[in-house]
Regions:
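Active-site C-terminal subdomain of aminotransferase-like
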Residues: 1-63, 69, 160, 170
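Conserved small-domain helix->loop->beta segment predominantly found in fold-type I
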Residues: 28-35, 52-102
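Short, flexible turn/loop "capping" segments at secondary-structure junctions
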Residues: 41, 91-93, 122-126
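Active-site proximal loops enriched in glycine and acidic residues that flank catalytic Cys/His/Asp
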Residues: 49, 88-90, 103, 124, ...
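Hydrophobic residues within well-ordered, non-membrane alpha-helices that form the packing/core
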Residues: 49-52, 75, 149, 153
Length: 170
């Protein structure tokens, strides 16, 4: 099977700097190049990498652990009367920057959370996944997310049929 691209550009040529007027596609993955990389985007990338070089990754990881531990503690405190089960490791050293809980009605609960601006993720059959980006997630955001989960469970607004409809993206 030969893959082809509908968009061809001069960098997809076998020898782009020969400036041959007849297009001869490269035989490697290079044939999928469309044109010159955007110089401005590379400048932005370089600037962002300069910022990243100044970051203390240990401090970022520590904040990640604090955010996820706070979320677990708040959810277990606020929602103790609901059938939520922590699926992620309790030990923050054993998990990344995400926390998963299971609930038999995970899909509509996550859809209700998303409708209330708490953006999480659902994984079949019953997982509610929450990601925490330590560079910009605030402790207040964690408290608000846990509070909204409690509100949705308490009011049972997740039972509204609008949240039951299947979607391609969770």
């Amino acid at each position: 099977a030969h893959a082809a691209t509908p968009l061809t550009g001069w960098q997809a040529h076998t020898d782009p700097f020969s400036f041959d007027t007849r297009f001869k596609p490269a035989s490697s993955i290079d044939k999928f190049r469309c044109g010159t990389p955007a110089v401005l985007s590379y400048i932005a990338l370089e600037s962002s990498l300069d910022i990243f070089e100044q970051l203390d990754m240990h401090a970022i990881r520590e904040k990640s652990k604090q955010l996820t531990t706070l979320f677990v503690d708040l959810v277990e405190s606020f929602c103790s009367t609901y059938p939520l089960q922590l699926v992620s490791p309790r030990d923050s050293d054993q998990r990344g920057s995400q926390v998963s809980f299971s609930h038999p009605e995970g899909w509509p609960i996550m859809q209700a959370l998303i409708a209330h601006r708490v953006i999480g993720d659902f994984r079949a059959p019953d997982l509610l996944r929450f990601g925490f980006a330590p560079l910009y997630t605030r402790y207040e955001d964690v408290w608000l997310a846990a509070s909204m989960l409690f509100h949705i469970l308490q009011t049972e607004c997740w039972k509204d049929p609008i949240y039951a409809a299947p979607k391609l993206v969770t």
